[in-house]
Every structure is written in C-alpha cells, then in structure tokens.
C-alpha cells in the first residue's frame, strides 16, 4: 500500500503503479519492508521509496531535494546514475543540495538562493565556489 499511496500523491493510478511495482521495489531495495507501514520507515527508507516512485513516472521535470543527504553510499551512487540516465533522456533535473561535489558532478548550471533571493546564477562550479566562499566568511 505504501507504493500505491505515494503513487497516488504523484497522480499515478493503481494500474500504472501495478505495472511498475517490481521496478520500484527493486530500485528502492525495500523488498523485505514493502509491507511495513510507512510510519515505521526511517527517513532514508522514505527517501528511497519516494525517489524510486518519482523516477518511474518519467516526468519532464524531476525535483530532487536533498535526496543524497540520506541513505548509504551505494544507494547514493545508484541515485546519481539514475539522475544521469534521466538527464541524458531529456528530463530536466531541479537538484537541491548543499553538497558542492554533488552539485558539480550532476549539474551544468546552478542557482544559489538565499532566502528566496538569487545570489548567483551560472556554471555550477563557479556558483558553488562563490557560495562556499561566502559560507566560510560567515
């Protein structure tokens, strides 16, 4: 039910979720926890499930907010590979992170926001380096 509920929140019907159920479970690596209520999931488990469902939807734009801040290294690498695959397929990725290495690795362009104000917009490495310099000063 966890998968169907999350899918419904994203506007996917039960038939679509049935069609992609095995793919979602396999990617999330939650096979042994698939029947455990979400309220008993850790934040990492919730993120795994949400990311797996979001990536089977094949949307034009995928918003990924700090997904790589949770989970183990192996799963983070799996997520990065999936994001690269989606980017190569034409999906626009809105990637939110405070991790400079991840931003530089996954993004060609970055926008640094500070309380909703655009501080910098440009190549990811340049924008992140300016952000990091500012953070070191404060």
Language model: regions and residue ranges:
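Helical segment within the ABC ATPase nucleotide-binding domain
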Residues: 76-89
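Conserved ABC ATPase "signature" region
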Residues: 4, 16-33, 52
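H-loop/switch region of ABC-family ATPase nucleotide-binding domains
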Residues: 97-98
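A short, surface-exposed alpha-helical micro-motif characterized by mixed small hydrophobic
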Residues: 103-105
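ABC ATPase "signature
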Residues: 121-122
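Conserved ABC ATPase "signature" C-loop
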Residues: 115-116, 131
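Q-loop/switch helix immediately C-terminal to the Walker
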Residues: 1-8
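A short, proline-enriched helix->beta-strand linker immediately N-terminal to the Walker B motif
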Residues: 55-64
